[in-house]
């Protein structure tokens, strides 16, 4: 699917919902987008916010032969280029920013989604067999199964046999859920309903792994299950969300090749509203073809 097709899908879905098509965010406003650089500078400041756009655009090469080339290179990528060296070692600011980004990534793995936040979104909360974050990181197999209490809650509080069941889970990035939720779930649910699909009760799974959607689909009798889950964070990118969609999942028979994945959903990647429109189109095609993953025809 090329960019033109994606834009057409977004226009179609947003128009059917009676909403304006969102305009692309300017690159300078996107996290992870190409930074806007001033003239190269070698000044290092302890007061600089290491997570700021200014820090990301910092050029630490001393006495450059072609400063304009460095500026253009720094603009062209979010990678760690033009940071300079102090002999064989990285410069202080470059090292501190590296450590800060690494810490941010670790923090989002270890943080918990606040229960108050889940309640504020009006979501039913259930858990996998995991009881705490440490167990979640060391026993991924338990994160693929719902707890007995969760199974009872789904059977008693959720719509049975929906066309599409939407599930939200923290996964390996708390920030991915809290940062993107309001921009992806409301338009996603509205788009699915506007398409005439029977949408199940959306809910939140704490400590969930991707394969848990198979058990959810089997219990609720859903034709398509859409799981929005936090991705494993990269260095300095802790807000990336993934969508795993599967048709008629079964615990015993569904394999990873049966899933269709849309990854890198965040303001510096695929914008959440755009992703919602693409997911709506994907769900419709899954229902038409009665397939997902590698079994779908393009």
Swiss-Prot record:
The keyword Lyase appears for this protein: yes
Places the protein is found: Bacterial microcompartment
Top-level EC class: lyase
Gene3D superfamilies: 6.10.140.690, 6.10.250.2060, Ethanolamine ammonia-lyase light chain (EutC)
GO process terms (BP): amino acid metabolic process; ethanolamine catabolic process
Any one Pfam family match given in the protein's UniProt record, by short name: EutC
Family: Belongs to the EutC family.
Record-given protein name: Ethanolamine ammonia-lyase small subunit
Organism per entry: Salmonella heidelberg (strain SL476)
């Amino acid at each position: 699917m090329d960019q033109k097709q994606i834009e057409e899908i977004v226009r179609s879905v947003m128009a059917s919902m009676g909403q304006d098509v969102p305009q692309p965010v300017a690159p300078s406003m996107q996290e992870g987008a190409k930074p806007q650089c001033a003239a190269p500078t070698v000044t290092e400041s302890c007061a600089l916010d290491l997570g700021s756009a200014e820090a990301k655009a910092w050029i630490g090469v001393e006495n450059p032969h072609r400063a304009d080339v460095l500026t253009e290179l720094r603009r062209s990528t979010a990678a760690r280029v033009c940071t300079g060296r102090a002999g064989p070692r990285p410069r202080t600011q470059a090292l501190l920013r590296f450590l800060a980004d690494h810490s941010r990534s670790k923090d989002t793995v270890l943080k918990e989604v606040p229960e108050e936040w889940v309640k504020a979104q009006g979501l039913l909360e259930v858990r996998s067999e995991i009881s705490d974050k440490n167990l979640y990181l060391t026993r991924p197999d338990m994160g693929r199964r719902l707890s007995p209490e969760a199974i009872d809650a789904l059977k008693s509080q959720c719509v049975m046999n929906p066309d599409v069941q939407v599930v939200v889970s923290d996964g390996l990035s708390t920030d991915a859920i809290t940062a993107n939720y309001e921009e992806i779930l409301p338009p996603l649910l509205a788009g699915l309903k506007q398409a005439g699909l029977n949408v199940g009760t959306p809910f939140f799974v704490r400590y969930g792994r991707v394969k848990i959607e198979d058990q959810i689909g089997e219990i609720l009798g859903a034709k398509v299950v859409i799981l929005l889950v936090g991705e494993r964070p990269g260095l300095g990118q802790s807000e990336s969300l993934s969508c795993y969609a599967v048709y008629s999942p079964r615990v015993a028979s569904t394999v990873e090749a049966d899933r269709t994945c849309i990854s890198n959903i965040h303001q510096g990647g695929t914008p959440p509203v755009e992703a919602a429109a693409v997911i709506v189109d994907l769900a419709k095609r899954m229902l038409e073809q009665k397939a997902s993953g590698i079994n779908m025809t393009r």
